[in-house]
A protein has these predicted regions:
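PRPP-dependent phosphoribosyltransferase catalytic core
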Residues: 162, 177-179, 184, 203, ...
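Short, glycine/charge-rich flexible loops or terminal/linker lids adjacent to PRPP-binding catalytic cores
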Residues: 316-363, 374, 401-411
Length: 509
């Protein structure tokens, strides 16, 4: 999962890109990068770290130009610890191209071999974004008929990308001296939208992963870029758009609405906040069928993205809603912890209980989802230590039983607490008195009701159905092997959690 921004203006764009990345910081906290273009020259700065840490005044001054793009990185392919794999990526031909990408290519290894053996292009990192950039460069080189570059040439190149590339990809790219290109995979798995505004009194076109990045920088949201569609904005600010996929279906990742996106964003016509309220409503029916409401004294959310679901659940059941956990926002990230003992300590550093809300009560804790189960187990124990008589746990999402291959770096199947276990076995593993999950079809109905025009969802981590149709057991095995290689490269012990999905919720940004 990453966050991307691209801007075409007649005034300097470095500050706008920076501001947009801050608004998307929840989508990536490992690295950040910005590229601007002045004339035919690119100016780039990228490094590991959060946006505020990577870009100082001197770095911003070194990013001139009226066109640019940026990315915050949360790696799902390649080496999360390599600064070389921070985006954007650059190639010098044709024209000069810079690209940032949100998603994950499921045929990256095949493409890498094809690029070397057939297209005679060299890939210098393990990043699938560099692979995608070189595929785009090769296709653009094939379609170009000489200067000036036409929108038709650009769209023909994107059609070539769609034919070759599998997986999820929302892309923003710069073509030196010509303009900005944005496109989305044929299933629209990862979000991308476009809007317009003013920058120092001049017209601006902006694309971004989420609508909140447009609104927070003073831009008007125009629309979502359609699955398979490409949008080309020339240096004059003229917007050209064309459908470039032979067959496109709108099937966004449902986990965006469950956890990943900010609640104040609207993705593919669906308010993320309203989606989470709806999940709370459907969850209420599941709770009633498992635990009589009379046996629940209080409903407490596990911060932060579960709050809308928890408030709706409490409202419908007529049970008091209370804040029982306080999050320490100044503790470092807990994404990678060597060993269970350190992970437990990190949870208690990140969250602290308000004991008076637990003492002598039967509490229902509400979380957005349960992935590994380690954090849930520790939180349940914290509630017991605070004096709770009984601790029930409800998940606004169904059991996460399958790995995600489309840009969410979840644990391998064996590390997922729900993989191969019944709900009762999961309950015993976590240690709660009752465990209530959302059901898959209920989740889909709750969110799809907000935009019936959707063709469906990628809900692969819940139902094991991979919408691109190319994911096999071998694909999963290769992913597991890659994760093991990553753990070996960083020299950690066998208990290292190389997944990036963990306690810090998106709403911290």
């Amino acid at each position: 999962m990453c966050g991307i921004v691209g801007i075409v203006s007649r005034a300097p764009v470095n500050q706008l890109i920076y501001d947009g990345l801050l608004l998307l910081q929840h989508r990536g906290q490992d690295a950040a990068g910005i590229v601007t273009q002045q004339g035919r020259k690119f100016y780039m700065h990228k490094a590991k770290g959060m946006v505020r840490d990577v870009f100082r005044t001197r770095n911003m001054r070194a990013l001139p130009g009226n066109v640019g793009l940026g990315q915050v990185r949360y790696p799902t392919a390649g080496n999360a610890f390599s600064e070389d794999e921070a985006q954007p990526f650059y190639v010098n031909a044709p024209f000069g191209l810079v690209l940032s990408h949100n998603g994950n290519l499921t045929n990256a290894a095949e493409l890498k071999a094809e690029l070397f053996n057939t297209d005679h292009r060299h890939i210098n990192t393990d990043s699938d974004s560099e692979v995608l950039l070189n595929v785009l460069a090769h296709e653009l080189e094939k379609t170009t008929r000489g200067l000036p570059l036409t929108p038709g040439d650009v769209f023909a190149a994107v059609r070539g990308v769609h034919r070759r590339v599998k997986g999820s990809y929302a892309v923003v790219a710069l073509i030196a001296g010509h303009g900005l290109l944005a496109f989305r995979d044929p299933f629209g798995i990862r979000p991308l939208c476009i809007g317009h505004g003013q920058n120092e009194g001049t017209a601006t076109v902006m694309v971004a992963s989420e609508s909140v990045a447009l609104e927070g920088t003073g831009h008007q949201f125009d629309r979502d870029i359609a699955p398979g569609e490409a949008v080309y904005v020339d240096l004059e600010g003229q917007v050209h758009a064309e459908q470039c996929a032979a067959k496109a279906q709108l099937m966004p990742c449902i986990f965006e609405f469950v956890y990943l996106a900010r609640p104040d964003s609207v993705l593919d016509g669906i308010s993320v906040y309203q989606a989470r309220l709806n999940l709370g409503e459907t969850l209420a029916k599941r709770v009633v069928s498992t635990v009589p409401p009379s046996e629940i004294d209080v409903i407490i959310p596990i911060p932060e993205s579960s709050r809308p679901s928890a408030t709706q659940l409490a409202h419908l059941l007529g049970i008091p809603y209370r804040e029982g956990f306080v999050k320490n926002r100044y503790v470092g990230r807990t994404f990678i912890m060597p060993g269970q003992g350190v992970r437990k300590k990190s949870v208690r550093q990140k969250l602290n209980v308000i004991a008076s809300e637990f003492k002598g009560r039967n509490v229902l804790l509400v979380d957005d989802s349960i992935v590994r189960g380690t954090t849930s187990r520790e939180i349940v124990q914290m509630a017991r230590d605070a004096g709770a008589r009984k601790v029930y746990l409800a998940s606004a999402a169904p059991p996460v039983r399958f790995p995600n291959v489309y840009g969410i770096d979840m644990p391998t199947p064996g590390e997922l607490v729900a993989h191969g276990r019944t709900v009762e076995e999961i309950r015993q593993e976590i240690g709660c008195d009752a465990l209530i999950y959302q059901d898959v079809e209920g989740m889909k109905r709750a969110i799809r009701s907000l935009n019936p025009a959707l063709d469906g969802f990628d809900a692969s981590c819940f139902d094991g159905v991979y919408v691109t149709g190319d994911v096999t057991a071998e694909t999963i095995a290769m992913m597991n092997s890659s994760r093991a290689d990553t753990a070996e490269k960083i020299g950690e012990d066998s208990d290292v959690d190389v997944s990036r999905l963990a306690l810090p919720n998106p709403q911290e940004a």
